[in-house]
């Protein structure tokens, strides 16, 4: 890797959150054109963080040569809307991320960790494979998980919708189906904290109904009209919130 990762983590993410791991992994999947994404959270018990394993899999384009080169050159963004540093948060919470990406007649395997050398050549396969990329997060690097909500599917669902609403709503308006599944597997439940094996999913039907307004300004050179989508959400104890 072309940057010292441990120092970069402290520089770019002084106050990270475990939810950023989900956000970054899902962002990568959506950027790769995935229509089906699964976030599988496996932990023996909430108070046994060393057993935590998270697997994020999708049916997107995967680690093609272009995508892998961008990943290897850590600070090279996809475009002006991406900073190119998000995946650093992976190593703030996990010591290693095992990556397997297959598509057509190729497969690429590598382990993303501190000191990653950027070497992951394509393996040519005999038979054609369906597109699938899986990131397996192992070696939880913290003493504890801060909140049950960091692992509970029903708590993560609204956060994911809020974070990716513009992208998901655009897909919905274009008639493109998608499904994002969040699954928790644990052998030691906590009924008081509503912590137990559970699965939920995000589909177009889960998105709020957006209102469209068109802003027109003939003085603009390239674009005279801009479409803006918004919705107003009631927030308990706080009135309404414009999103």
Model-derived features: positions:
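Bergerat-fold GHKL ATPase/HATPase_c domain
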Residues: 1-34, 38, 42-43, 65-72
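GHKL/Bergerat-fold ATPase module in large chromosome/replication-associated machines
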Residues: 176-243
